[in-house]
Design a protein with these regions (language model features):
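A compositional/biophysical signature of low hydrophobicity enriched in polar/charged and small residues
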Residues: 1-163
Length: 163
């Protein structure tokens, strides 16, 4: 008997999948545009999206900003190992306040966390690693990979319908 890793409370219907895919491509679509593409009235499309928001399927909306255009051209992935797991709560609180940290993932393997960071340059990255992480947060070790170019970066999430 297999046990699913994740369980949805309410199934995602085919029309919800279509709405989500449309919104992931264009989060600024009007209710009228969305309704037309879904074969619904604008109020029905709005109701469907609001239900997805209330269920937590849609967590929010954001502008996708080019980091280089706003002075943060350097992207790096930083694997972090904490000196002690007693430092975990303080580490997570501090990370959540750091603007340069775009993502923080608790991971399996040799390291504890994987961070995606955006910096102004290598000096900014060095300061983040040496001063912010290692000196202040009880980080035992970091391993950094600097991104040279990005072939694909997407906010699209693959979704399976359950009808």
């Amino acid at each position: 008997m297999s046990i699913p890793l994740f369980r949805r409370e309410t199934p995602i219907r085919a029309l919800d999948v279509k709405a989500l895919n449309l919104l992931m491509r264009n989060g600024r679509a009007t209710w009228a545009e969305l309704g037309q593409l879904l074969g619904l009235s604008a109020p029905s499309a709005a109701d469907r999206v609001r239900k997805l928001e209330q269920r937590g399927v849609i967590r929010g909306y954001a502008a996708l900003v080019d980091p280089a255009s706003v002075g943060h051209p350097l992207t790096a992935y930083v694997s972090v190992s904490l000196a002690s797991h007693r430092n975990r709560a303080a580490f997570l609180r501090a990370i959540s306040k750091m603007d340069q940290v775009a993502e923080c993932h608790h991971v399996a393997g040799d390291d504890d966390y994987l961070l995606k960071v955006r910096c102004r340059g290598t000096q900014d990255l060095d300061h983040l690693l040496a001063t912010e992480l290692k000196d202040k947060l009880g980080v035992a070790r970091t391993r950094t990979t600097i991104v040279l170019s990005t072939a694909k970066e997407s906010v699209h999430v693959p979704i399976d319908a359950v009808d």
